[in-house]
Amino acid sequence: MGLEAVLEEIREKGRKEADAIRAESKMDSDRILAEADQKVAGIKAEAEEASTKQAARVTAQEISAANLLVKREILNTQKGLLDEVYEGTIAEIAKLPESFHREAIKKLLTEAKKEIPKGKIHCNARDEAAAKAVLAEKEFSGFILGEPAHIDGGILIEGEGGELQIDYSYRTFMNKVWESGLKDASDILFG
């Protein structure tokens, strides 16, 4: 074997080793690129999932806020309507004839007399004549008419010495009825 053949064999061996190294390097680089592609795909999927979740969360918050705002507006409107009904009822009671107010004062004073047998009653200026007519009756001789009160109707009763007072104004009774029946009224009106 000549020198030329040995050189050719060395060259061939070098080429084979170089080809093997290149093939191994190619496999390594392909593997690294595949792993990188997998990582990129995973990161991309996580980012898409996170952004989808965040978008859903923001959308849900916005919907909740909008629903709350609408509900608040509905409740404010309903409260406004109920307040109008309340004030309208007080106004309609005030328009009732003098005979109604006289009877009401008589019944209220009869009830109050159980707790305050003598004293002073106050009513609004509109009902003074009705109150005087009731006080003229013998059973109410222990009561006198005081200064007019700023009430919608009914009476305020003050015991002798002013220590005991009872509020039998229409608004007080209306408030009791209103508070006890407000939910029922709301359910009927607004379902």
Swiss-Prot record:
Top-level division of the source organism's lineage: Archaea
Topology with respect to the bilayer: Peripheral membrane protein
Subcellular location, principal: membrane
GO cellular component, as recorded: plasma membrane; proton-transporting two-sector ATPase complex, catalytic domain
A Pfam short name: vATP-synt_E
Any one GO MF annotation of this record: ATP binding
Biological-process GO terms, alphabetical: proton motive force-driven plasma membrane ATP synthesis
Subcellular location: Cell membrane
Gene3D superfamilies according to UniProt: ATP synthase, E subunit, C-terminal, F1F0 ATP synthase subunit B, membrane domain
Keywords for this protein: ATP synthesis, Cell membrane, Hydrogen ion transport, Ion transport, Membrane, Transport
Keyword presence, Transcription: no
Role: Component of the A-type ATP synthase that produces ATP from ADP in the presence of a proton gradient across the membrane.
HAMAP family for the chain: ATP_synth_E_arch
Subunit structure: Has multiple subunits with at least A(3), B(3), C, D, E, F, H, I and proteolipid K(x).
Family, per entry: Belongs to the V-ATPase E subunit family.
UniProt name for this protein: A-type ATP synthase subunit E
Gene: atpE
